[in-house]
Amino acid sequence: MNSKAFYQQMFAIAIPVALQSLLTSFLNTLDTMMISSLGDASIAGVGLANQVFFLFTLICFGINTGSSVLFAQYWGVRDVPQVRKINQASLMLSTAISVAFMFVAMLFPYGILELFTKDAAVVQAGGDYLRVAALTYVITAWSFSLGSTLRSTGNPKVPLVATMSSFVANAFFNYILIFGKLGLPAMGVVGAALGTVVARLIEIGVLVFVIKRYQGPLQIPIRHLQKIPKEFWTVYWKTTLPVIVNETFWALGQVFYNAAYAMVGTQATAAVQIAVAIQGLAFVIVRGLGSSCSIMLGQSIGKNKIDRAKKDANRFIILSIITGVVIGAIESLTPQWTLLLFGHISPEVYTLGQQLLQVMGVIFILKTINSIIVVGVLRGGGDTHYGMKLEMSCVWLVGVPLSLLAAGVWHLPVTLVVICAGMEEVTKVVVGFYRVYSQKWIHRLVQD
């Protein structure tokens, strides 16, 4: 594939994915912006409550990205029956996980918040939000599965349209429900949760509406689920289970990081939530690159074009370095501008937010490279077992222990706790580069 064809295919996938990620990330930022006027406790409470949603979505992400490894290779040879089976399996697993998370979050919202903090105001705000927001979990799981299938089969614009609809609805309903407009009572954090529920319903409605008119691998009667043969499940679990385990334990690691930040204090927690929301906006380009990388490499390997896959992997690695440096520098050098989005935060949280963004901008460079290596190259090449071992070891043997020691034992300020957590990325980038250039990451899963 020449350079022009490479970039055309990359942008065709990356731009819709990046735009969808931008809207999704801005939804989270919008929630934080609106809630910021309610005080530090509300920001911290909603941020900690969303750790449950974060863990849940990462498990769903694992199910769907693991499935997309098979999607890409089988779609590369247009094996529609296998693609349908993969879609069935991912929908079934995502639904089961979402129901479990929904019931736990609805039944024990305040107990979950108390695992992070003993601040009564934070627990109250977070618990109130979590009990209502849990209603979105099943809907979100379906949106993830259907959107992932559409992207992997060459239709990234459909989930983008659905997310745009959700974004507009969330902004509108959040505004009227949080602050009590159009004759409605002001509901605060509960209003933010209700706004999210309505937005998710609209998103899944758009997806289902389009899919009913889409002649392809998504039109599958539910009764076909029982016809999936044992041989398929063997291949499916071999590829997807490492990704599911990877994302689950990586997400748990992020939850532990937030627990460490909460040890520093409520203002530190609020500042971290704001900084993470801002960085989430910057990370959308990386998500687009990662999706392009995984799908393009998977399709090339499925077609047995191994040399093309190797060459494209190197191109994506170079792009990740350039992207990380440019965006990381902007993030580090402009915190005073990005924090203007949050006009009602306390001076202490504002100062901490500036310091955190400067530090996180540097770490962002490594996060970008690692995302392309793990999510793009290793998963696109079917090297999911190695990716799992790499991420789990770096999170649980490096990042989590250091951050907990920094906050709970050494009592360091939150900026240094974030740096300790960032040691995960330093370790990962060294080992990840070695794996990519060993060329042991290429695994062809399609049987001719």
Locate the predicted segments by residue.
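Transmembrane alpha-helix boundary and packing residues in multipass membrane permease domains
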Residues: 17, 21, 32-33, 69, ...
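Generic alpha-helical transmembrane segments of integral inner-membrane proteins
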Residues: 18, 22, 26, 30, ...
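Transmembrane helical elements of multi-pass membrane transporters/channels
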Residues: 12-28, 132, 166, 199-203, ...
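Short runs within selected transmembrane alpha-helices of multi-pass transporters and secretion channels
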Residues: 64, 133-152, 159-170, 192-207, ...
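Helix-terminus/linker motif at the lipid-water interface of multi-pass membrane proteins
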Residues: 22, 26-44, 113-120, 176-187, ...
